[in-house]
Amino acid sequence: MRTLTLCWLALLALAVTGVLLGGAGDSPWLLAAVLACAVAKGWLIGERFMELAHAPALWRRLLLAWPLLMALAVGAALYLARMNN
């Protein structure tokens, strides 16, 4: 139970950090930090709350690949939108 509490606190800290960074300005580095927070939250949820830490390596890699791909897609879309303005 202690591990889940620590994970919950980490998720809370990552969520607050993402919100604060998202409202701090409009810089590519801030965007990267917000997306990194989102990927870290996805990893924590998969590894601890969904208990995939003991799952086969393929499932763990696929679960981490999804938030990474989504973060890359969002980052690329925002980069392209910035280039067009």
UniProtKB/Swiss-Prot annotation:
Signal peptide boundaries: none
Alphabetic keyword roster: Cell membrane, Membrane, Transmembrane, Transmembrane helix
Spans traversing the lipid bilayer: 4-24, 27-47, 61-81
Main localization (coarse): membrane
Membrane topology: Multi-pass membrane protein
Cystine pairs: none
One Pfam family, short name: COX4_pro
Location of the protein in the cell: Cell membrane
InterPro entries for the chain: Cyt_c_oxidase_su4_prok
Cellular component terms per the entry's GO annotation: plasma membrane
Protein name: Uncharacterized protein PA0522
Lineage start: Bacteria, Pseudomonadati, Pseudomonadota, Gammaproteobacteria, Pseudomonadales
